[in-house]
């Protein structure tokens, strides 16, 4: 089945959830950027988060960007998503190689080390909303949990995972975001904290054949669960020759004049999908110029 996200409520509306499977998205990113296993895991987690957070957008035109600037060897990551859960992203150093951590897992935390997580939301206002928090672990899910608590004041649990095959392709990927509503009871909060504290690995459950809804129902066993939407999610880059041409036009007369003087093609590579675009600028000589050329 293709990647998708479910959105809904649980425990009589006291909790909202977003859960999804993103294997195809992460494998597409791995193939495009030729990422190492640890870079695939890091980028895959952030892409999954972007897709899930895209499902939280209120307007069709909303856009969000997740950006991590860090001191670790991975150099940083950027993911963008829209309200339709289309995502794209890249990692600054896709070739980073690290030993496994003491649990035998890909060491995403070491790849990131210290840094800052930025969440940029363009919701149609004059200026985008920008929320920033320090990385608390470098595992990305915990960093986003901290972001929601401190920057948006929403008690949230985030789980993200990428499971790799031995040949370094993506075996499973997915995640969930669970958020308490303001009127959630103390009894529910205590029970949910215990259940989430015992939760181990979302990719292990996906690898057992469970679907996102199965995982949500397992977490909320004994509570009612209502899915309100099922949203397809996919990798999508909206770069194009037309957008590239418009970017060149927007450079201004002085910059374009300098490019014309160089008399060389302009080459641009899209960081998100590695597509390359080439543009050759030229001018038609005026009558005076034609006279001089003779």
Which role fits each region the language model picked out?
Residues 270:
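Short cysteine-rich clusters marking metal-coordination/redox-active sites
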Residues 250-260:
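A conserved acidic, glycine/proline-rich C-terminal tail/linker
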